[in-house]
Amino acid sequence: MSGYLESVLVLLAINTILAYAAFLPMVAGQLNLGVAAFVAIGAYSAGYLSNSFGLHPVAAALAAVAVAAMLGWIVAFPILRTRGIYLALATFALNQLVQGTILNLDAVGGASGYPVPAHIGFPVVAAFAAAVIVLVFLAFRTRFGISVTAVSDDERAADLMGLSVRGLQSAAFTAGAALAGLAGALYAHHFNYVEAQNYGVLFSIYVVLYVLLGGTQTAYGPLLGAAVFTLLPELLRGSAAWRYVIFACLIIAIMSLRPQGVIVRGSWFSKRAA
């Protein structure tokens, strides 16, 4: 496999994990613009544990997932007390806080970036991505997944039915943070370098767009959105400077024609899944 093809496939796998990191809170009715914060936490935690304590990169990645999940759980309760635009602003502020803190931490390179020599190859990254896809699909066949979907459909009705809306939203937010941390850890250990400047709010917006493009109504949506955003720019590479213009026009056209996302309940994918 060529180095270029491997890099594209690795990015596809990581972006798929990222898409599900944004998807889980969105299914619970929460727009999280702080995805990049947890990606940065995962990347730097894994790199630091690997560099400073000699942890195997896979072990460091799993530890980074735990760190991101713990921090996600801690911030979920105060952040999820807000709603709508205020929730988006709160997660935006979280993103800025984490990015600013890392930029001023000399222990992890600050603004100069942080090298992570220990390497994780494509097969391991692909295995993690496959595991995430399977777990998400299985989760949405469980009581938890059905309950989260009910919250998304009608939060007030879900509350009247006795569901713990706040608990479900916190769990979805925490799970999303864990997946974002995993994506960050895999990126750090595959590309062997991380920079805090890359994890701004624009990064989070791109990830949210993966989900909005594919659709939030089924677990197939994020998978499609990540594939389109990863592969389409590469397929348009031959168009040189115009590829991003063409790409943007295609995305705008798709989202205008399918405002609920390409894949919705009742579509062919949903019927196949059932």
Predicted segments — roles?
Residues 1-274:
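Transmembrane alpha-helices and adjacent helix-loop boundaries
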